[in-house]
């Protein structure tokens, strides 16, 4: 099922989330010269498209890999990914597990196979 998963997440909100994470950890909040503009473009273009859930999660991972900020890219996009899926009706244990998979996938600590399995489990 495709929908506009990112429609309520303008780039300014992404920047604000990263700023908050950096402030909390006393880290520099600053855009990178190489990754900021490409990530912003990717994100903003995806916001207005209907995407599968997998595609929306992949946008977060791709933006993380572009490293638009000096610090906490993974945390920023993983937090958004985990929040995106809160509206999916799941039993508490399954919801917790799926949020974990989404966050770890976006952060790059697990791969496509694990995400695919978690998405298949949603359909059961």
Predicted regions and their residues:
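FIC/Doc superfamily catalytic core
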Residues: 1-124
């Amino acid at each position: 099922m495709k929908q506009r998963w990112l429609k309520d997440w303008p780039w300014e909100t992404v920047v604000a989330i990263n700023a908050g994470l950096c402030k909390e950890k006393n880290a520099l909040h600053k855009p990178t010269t190489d990754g900021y503009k490409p990530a912003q473009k990717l994100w903003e273009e995806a916001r207005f498209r209907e995407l599968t859930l997998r595609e929306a999660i992949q946008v977060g991972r791709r933006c993380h890999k572009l490293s638009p900020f000096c610090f906490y890219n993974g945390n920023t996009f993983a937090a958004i990914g985990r929040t995106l899926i809160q509206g999916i009706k799941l039993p508490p244990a399954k919801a917790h597990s799926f949020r974990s998979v989404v966050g770890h996938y976006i952060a790059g600590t697990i791969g496509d196979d694990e995400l695919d399995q978690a998405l298949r489990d949603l359909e059961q």
